Amino acid sequence: MQGNEFLNRPFILNNKINDKKIKLGFYRELSCSPSSPGFEEHFPSNPNTKAPFVRYLEKIDDLEQEIAEDYKMLDEIKNEVDNAIDVVEDPMEQMILRYRYLEFLSMPDISVRMHYSLRWKKKLHRRALDSFERGHP
């Protein structure tokens, strides 16, 4: 696994969690909204006795459990990446990698926080990635 791929694992998982949160919001809206009546003629052999919103409530419960598990996994991956970043010797490079891959800051935000120009910050980031790949197995 490339160093960049290893470092991006928390970011990817965080995006998946955010997508699940959006999906959870849709399910919550659907569980509160009335369903439209069906005017077509149909004769179910096994009538459904559950209210229409119950299936959305079940999906909400399942999704909330998945999100909780994903947060636990995200913490584990962040700890693993944080320990791997310690391999880099330069503290400024470590700081750049932590801002980027553990706090999910954008390049302009990192450059503002570190009081560097964006161009210099990108150069330091490339150098930090090279140092990380040399030290990480």
Regions found by a protein language model. Give the residues of each.
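N-terminal interaction/assembly modules
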Residues: 1-87, 134-137
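N-terminal positioning helix adjacent to the helix-turn-helix/winged-helix DNA-binding module
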Residues: 77-80, 91-93, 124
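Short amphipathic alpha helix immediately N-terminal
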Residues: 89-103
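Short alpha-helical "recognition helix" segments of helix-turn-helix
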Residues: 109-114
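DNA major-groove recognition helices of helix-turn-helix
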Residues: 121-132
